[in-house]
């Protein structure tokens, strides 16, 4: 198991990642424009990866869109993009038709909850069952030209075992259950901070922890 460079955000910086993702989604959906990060906080110049999830707040809270900053999990460790720009790109992709089959519409925006996961450590593993710590490690799976990922907080929120966590990530990548055991499938673990909108005007963003 090997680790990459650590990037840790303050709560204020984390809250701003969510604001930037929200602004990027709205600019894309309403005007077809790419949000410019502008004068970024110092932490946003770090070269690291980010993921964005868009969930509907209606009904059972179905996933409306999700995307990472890179087109392939193989590129997770290639820190060639600043965090601010990575968030903008991921937010736009999450809101696009390519993410969950249909582009987010303007009327949906008030009922969309935005969350951001910033990658703080990259963990390369040959034995995910042994190495995964639930609530700490996100999972990214890449194989057969497909890729998928899940936040580190999801297995704790949903009471998944390590095996279920890996299988569900395989399904996210359109791979069969158990594909994570195949030699030609790459499993990468990542540690990250997850920040999410709350819908509360007084405390609009929370940091999720296990």
UniProtKB/Swiss-Prot annotation:
PROSITE patterns: AMMECR1. InterPro entries: AMMECR1, AMMECR1_dom_sf, AMMECR1_domain, AMMECR1_N. Residues 12-206 form the AMMECR1 domain. It holds the Pfam family AMMECR1. Signal peptide: none annotated. PANTHER family: AMME SYNDROME CANDIDATE GENE 1 PROTEIN, AMMECR1 HOMOLOG. NCBIfam families: TIGR00296 family protein (TIGR00296). This is Protein VNG_2543C. It comes from Halobacterium salinarum (strain ATCC 700922 / JCM 11081 / NRC-1).
């Amino acid at each position: 198991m090997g680790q990459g460079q650590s990037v840790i955000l303050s709560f204020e910086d984390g809250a701003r990642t969510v604001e930037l993702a929200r602004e990027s989604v709205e600019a894309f959906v309403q005007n077809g424009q790419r949000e410019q990060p502008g004068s970024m906080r110092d932490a946003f110049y770090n070269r690291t990866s980010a993921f964005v999830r868009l969930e509907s707040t209606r009904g059972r809270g179905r996933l409306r869109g999700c995307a990472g900053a890179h087109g392939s999990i193989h590129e997770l460790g290639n820190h060639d993009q600043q965090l601010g720009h990575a968030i903008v790109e991921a937010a736009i992709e999450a809101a696009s038709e390519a993410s969950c089959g249909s582009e987010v519409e303007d009327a949906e925006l008030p009922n969309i909850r935005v969350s951001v996961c910033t990658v703080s450590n990259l963990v390369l593993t040959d034995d995910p069952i042994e190495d995964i710590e639930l609530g700490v490690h996100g999972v990214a799976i890449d194989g057969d030209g497909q890729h998928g990922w899940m936040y580190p907080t999801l297995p704790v929120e949903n009471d998944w075992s390590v095996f279920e966590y890996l299988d569900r990530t395989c399904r996210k990548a359109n791979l069969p259950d158990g594909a994570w055991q195949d030699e030609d499938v790459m499993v990468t673990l990542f540690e990250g901070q997850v920040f999410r909108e709350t819908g509360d005007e007084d405390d609009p963003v929370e940091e999720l922890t296990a």
